[in-house]
Amino acid sequence: MKYLVIGLGNLGRAIAKDLTRVGNEVIGVDMDLHRVDMLKNDIAGAVALDSTDKEALSTLPLSEMDAIIVTFGKDFGTSVQTVALLKSLDAGKLIVRAISSIHETVIRAIGVSEIITPEKDFSTMYTSQASLGGLFRHWYKVTDTEHLYKIGRAHV
C-alpha cells in the first residue's frame, strides 16, 4: 500500500518507518529540512514543503495514496489548515492525529472520521495493564485477548 505521512516528528517518523518495515511505500512530508534529511534513506521518499500551502500540497501524488496520515503534535492551526486543504484537494482517505478534544471536534467537522489520539490511547492501555497488577509486563505484545481474559479471571 502507499501512504503519505505529513509531519515527521516523533509519531510521524515512527509511523513512516514502521509502515515501510512491513512492506508499504511511504512518502514523508515536513517543513523542517532536518527532519526530512533524517528520514530520507529509511522510506521511499521524503519531501520538505509547507503543508499549509495549497499549491505545494497539490504537487504531491495525493490521488495515488491509499491513505494520508497527518501527525502534527503541537500546532493545532497547521494541522487544521493542512486537513482542510487536503479535503479541498479531494485527497482521499485521511487519518489525523488530534491533540485535544476541541481539535478532534474540529477535524471531525471538516469530515475526517479516522482520528489518532496517541496520548489518550496510551493512557487507556496503560491503565488496563496497571490494573492487572503487573501480571503482564509487555501488555502491548498480547494479542490473544480471549485467553488474557480467562487468565485474568483465574487469578481473581
Model-derived segments and spans:
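Cytosolic regulatory regions of ion transport systems
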Residues: 1-155
